[in-house]
Amino acid sequence: MKLFKKIASFVLASGVFFSSSVFADTVKIAFIDPLSGPFATTGTIGLAEWKFAVEKLVNEKGGVLGGKKMEVVALDNKMDGKESLVQVQVAIDQGIRFIAQGNSSGIANAITDMVKKHNKRNPDKQVIFLNYSAVDPALTNDKCQFWHFRFDANADIKMDVITDVIAGESGIKKMYLIGQDYSFGKAVAAAAEKYLAQKTSIEIVG
């Protein structure tokens, strides 16, 4: 829940950048994640968490920017990269200046690129990307940019801690890595190989 207190503070701090959103009666956040298809459960749970936290931790405590309420607007990206960018544009066209997404680092990479280009071309309609769970390290390394704000630890940080625990288990001799065939899975595999080699003599067999 501390996450959403940070979001509220962030909205307050960044209000200077967004003239149109500041003067609106309600500060809106577009939640762009899967709400249909095989990943709908993940997106629906995330949406419920955002709505609950915004209502309980922000609106019921007086709102932001001098008492303005916050609202989460749900947009279904169907867990598809192209559809995600369509929904980002839908949000922008509706005057929404805060984009929240977290399921799929591949999609997050596409959104951060779009937001960067949009803000360069539209300095009077700048958008901030609130990345709440896409943990590809590239998003805050090679692709680090001012308009992308990540709340979660990246895959390198998480794997560093996980391999500390693994290193303490003397009975583990071999390990097989299974992961997704896109940016997130590849980042996790690379971090696992790196830290296991540094901390253990475990053989990675696949």
Task: List each model region and its residues.
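Bacterial N-terminal signal peptides that target proteins for export
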Residues: 1-11
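Hydrophobic core
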Residues: 12-17
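Sec/Tat signal peptide C-region and signal peptidase I cleavage site
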Residues: 18-24
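Cleaved targeting-peptide boundary
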Residues: 24-30
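Extracytoplasmic "Venus flytrap"
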Residues: 30-53, 75-82, 103-104, 178-187
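Signal peptide-proximal N-terminal region
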Residues: 48-72, 197-201
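Short, well-structured alpha-helical segments in soluble
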Residues: 74, 78-97, 114-117, 164-168
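Extracytoplasmic ligand/sensor domains, especially the bilobed periplasmic-binding protein
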Residues: 97-206
